[in-house]
Amino acid sequence: MSQDAFVAWARAHAIPISIPGTDESYDDLRFLDAWLDEKRILLVGESAHYLHEWNRWRARLFKYLALHHGYTTFVLECGLVEGRLVHDYVAGADTQWNEIARAINNVWGVWAEINELIRWMREWNARPDRPFELRFYPMDGTANWTHAGRAYEAVHAFAARVDPALAEDMEAWLAGGVAEVSLADRTEVSDARYCDLIGAASLVVSRIEQARLAYTAASSYDDYDWSLRAAQILRDVLMAIAQTEADFEVGVRQLWNVRDVSM
């Protein structure tokens, strides 16, 4: 299809939308009803992180889907390791708001529209008469893929609870190396050191997977799932940084390719 043909098709099929400043009515989104039908997952393409209109429309869309179509879960492109705080806050955990805003990385946390939606979800869950619980999940890695420190901390804290021997092994194998490795200093780490660290992180993932029943019994299903994913992210961040060339114009594509596969 030529560019002109696409433009003609898009103009003929475009649906005007409005972005009201209040949520008194959602009539502007009623056009979605026939199209949604019985669909249970809705993917919304990203136009930009930094536009009020985009963030406002997406927040209103999720509210409408929850209120009128029974949607329960909002997934955002922000760090999974840090974002567990947000997940727990929406579920009712008593956490200071400043910590929540900082936990929403990829620049989402600074936008009032996202903040307001998270508070709205928490308020929904606090209602005794709510029809179902709303949940927030982050889908990215950690620290904008610049270091693995927070992932290490999350996994080590879990290991200390469920298997002190694993926590001790992590300290011996990974603590110093994780502190050394960052995107900015990636060329100062040898290939052999990267191989050792990635191998150690992979072994941690394997041990968590093998001990699923014991670790779940010592914690919870949720704690186990979050911690396993954090361990996988720890490994993947190390791999991503190791594969990022010194010439960042080339390396940035390598970094984001590994990151996108990991997500």
Which residues does each PLM region occupy?
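Structured catalytic-domain cores with a bias toward divalent-metal coordination
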Residues: 1-263
